Amino acid sequence: MRILTVLLALMAGATVAKAETLQTAIFAGGCFWCVESDFDKVEGVVETVSGYTGGTLQNATYRNHGEHREAVRITFDADIVSYDQLLYVFWRTVDPTDAGGQFCDRGHSYLTGIFALNEAQATAARASKDALRGRLGAPIVTEIFPASDFWDAETYHQNYHQKNANRYNYYRTGCGRDARVAQLWGDEAPFANNH
């Protein structure tokens, strides 16, 4: 019985330690299906959830999301991947020079954005944005905001790239996302044409 108690205590300690290394990031990068798909490929990402953030409407939905942007809440293991590494991936999977949306998706809900959950994330996001100035031949228009309420998208949007792979790939290719990302970032584009 004593050994069982010790083992349970050790396992509980490991669970608490693991929980402390789990962190959250929120990125808006146009269509949340694509953002979710890209970050699901990153080692150390534990979960991605598509949703809406940045607006004021309560209980946002796809049909009624007000001034929210499509975004993805990312849970990651900071022992495996850092927030700075996620920022690197984010920038290189979007067109941060597009002030009208992303790729074929136009309008406010498809604008890019970084939603910082604390001052450390805000500082890292600003530094990563500053490091890109002058690299792409146009101003970086992606905004950095303090995180606000995040409303999970409807169930059919979650893991869309897995549940509806053919439709998703047709959409992604037709929208020109990978072609534009490859044009902007070249060899630095981690997932262009990798779907």
Segments the model singles out, each with a brief description of its role:
Residues 2-14:
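Bacterial N-terminal signal peptides
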Residues 18-195:
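Flexible coil/turn and secondary-structure edge motifs
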